[in-house]
Swiss-Prot record:
GO terms for cellular component: membrane. The gene is opdK. Disulfide bonds: none annotated. This is MFS-type transporter opdK. PANTHER family: MAJOR FACILITATOR SUPERFAMILY (MFS) PROFILE DOMAIN-CONTAINING PROTEIN-RELATED (PTHR11360:SF224), MONOCARBOXYLATE TRANSPORTER (PTHR11360). It is a multi-pass membrane protein. It is found in: Membrane. It comes from Penicillium oxalicum (strain 114-2 / CGMCC 5302). The keyword ATP-binding does not apply. One of its GO terms (molecular function) is transmembrane transporter activity. MFS-type transporter; part of the gene cluster that mediates the biosynthesis of oxopyrrolidines, polyketide-amino acid hybrid compounds with feature structures of tetramic acid.
């Protein structure tokens, strides 16, 4: 790290080695040639009030967007047992998978808006789509209406919120970017605790329609605060849209490997996220207790998104991420697969909540590490879009496996574990490319 290199050589190799060009004049030069490239205006050693307010805003934005998405398992169970009880698990699963797809797949658009206009424009548009979609969901009675409102409209809104909420605060924290990113992402865990409790208790008292409206009003308040407080430490210059900016990073082997890691990780992760509640009810857990699994999962996930950031700072992001992926695979196959009693299911929920939180929190930080600062927005969007393809397909595939196995969840669990195994293998290859075979090398 301390050796001196020619700036051009360093710039050309920076993406492959996971480092950033070190000179501000070099960044400024790149910004004139890259499309919608934000330019770093300063590198403060001490963060002021503006930085901390932006971090708080990012936390609230993730609370209202990804935090809401974290309670999809409740709606999978609710729809299968009530509103859409005439539909199969696979058909109901499309509501969640389409939501995941738009949440992740629209990220290139969100990244483009963020790079060109800053965090507030995509957050304002995303707030409208997210709140409007939930309001329309409160009126939905047919299958296609749930797809259009909760999956498409609200999904687009969450995507437009997540990218700037997660990215903008990190521009202030150059020395602790991973930790700052972990703090903002942890907002989704807290949202994943509050919203399930809120939905669970309101459904029985005020009904489905007003439950959705109450959640939408809370999200609206949080998003107004987020819009007011958030900012970034870069200058955003809108320029002509060029599709190649999103496709060019895929030519880089390291970035392509990271996209494959994301695809298979989300392929495996969203199966327990979607089917955890309904599978626990299937194996004898009460509906009330089954619904409470989601806030338990997300409560533990909060620590999973924060604590590993400190480990990553000491041992390396990639190293800690690989360990979390291996743990996820083992927990899926060794705990969720054989779990039939309430105690075993709760133990799985606690374990998976922590390790899944770690992978969700560390994954975007790896993308930040191997991307130059002036390309973070659309590179992050591209990686999320690829992950969205995995999120789109895994719940319906798992649903077909469940239906084909007489309603049992064994094959779906195996599918999830194998997807994690493939993702881990690809991540090991990426780690070796970045830091070599040394087990003690910090990567």
């Amino acid at each position: 790290m301390s050796e001196t290199r020619d700036p051009r050589t360093h710039s050309e190799s920076s993406l492959e080695k996971g480092t950033h060009p070190p000179h501000q004049d070099e960044l400024a030069t790149n910004s004139t040639t890259k499309d919608a490239s934000p330019v770093i205006t300063s590198t403060p050693k001490k963060q002021g009030a503006k930085a901390w307010l932006s971090l708080a805003a990012g936390f609230m934005g993730m609370f209202a967007s990804f935090g809401w998405v974290n309670c999809v398992a409740i709606f999978q169970a609710e729809y299968e047992m009530n509103q859409l009880r005439d539909y199969s698990s696979s058909q109901v699963g499309w509501i969640s998978s389409v939501l995941f797809f738009f949440m992740l797949g629209v990220s290139p658009v969100a990244g483009r808006l963020y790079d060109g206009y800053g965090p507030r424009l995509p957050i304002m548009i995303g707030c409208f789509f997210h709140v409007f979609g939930l309001m329309m969901t409160s009126l939905a009675t047919r299958y296609y209406q749930f797809i259009l409102s909760q999956s498409v409209c609200s999904g687009i809104g969450t995507s437009l919120i997540i990218t700037p909420a997660m990215t903008a605060p990190t521009t202030y924290f150059h020395d602790r970017r991973a930790l700052a990113g972990g703090v903002t992402i942890a907002g989704s865990s807290l949202g994943g605790v509050v919203f399930p409790f809120m939905v669970n208790h309101l459904l029985s008292s005020i009904g489905f329609a007003w439950t959705m409206r109450a959640c939408a009003f809370l999200i609206l308040v949080l998003m107004v605060i987020t819009y007011t407080l958030i900012s970034s430490n870069v200058t955003h210059i809108p320029k002509e849209f060029k599709l190649k900016n999103y496709l060019t990073p895929l030519r880089e082997c390291n970035f392509l490997l990271l996209c494959l890691v994301s695809f298979f990780m989300y392929w495996g992760m969203f199966i327990p996220y979607v089917y955890m509640v309904i599978s626990s009810i299937h194996y004898g857990m009460s509906v009330q207790m089954g619904y409470n699994l989601i806030p338990i999962l997300n409560g533990i996930s909060f620590f999973g998104r924060i604590v590993p950031q400190f480990w990553a700072r000491k041992y390396g992001i990639c190293n800690v991420f690989i360990l979390a992926m291996i743990a996820s695979m083992v927990i899926i196959l060794g705990s969720w697969l054989p779990s039939r009693s309430n105690a075993a299911i709760i133990v799985f929920t606690l374990l998976f909540g922590f390790v899944s939180g770690a992978t969700i929190g560390l994954g975007p930080m790896i993308a930040l590490t191997i991307s130059p600062p002036n390309e973070v927005g659309y590179r992050m969007g591209t990686a999320f879009a690829v992950a969205g393809l995995g999120a789109l397909t895994s719940p319906p595939i798992a649903g077909e496996l469940i239906t084909g196995n007489g309603g049992d969840y064994v094959y779906a669990s195996v599918f999830s574990g194998v997807a994690y195994a493939v993702s881990t293998l690809v991540m090991v290859i990426l780690r070796v490319r970045l830091g070599g075979w040394g087990l003690t090398t910090k990567v």
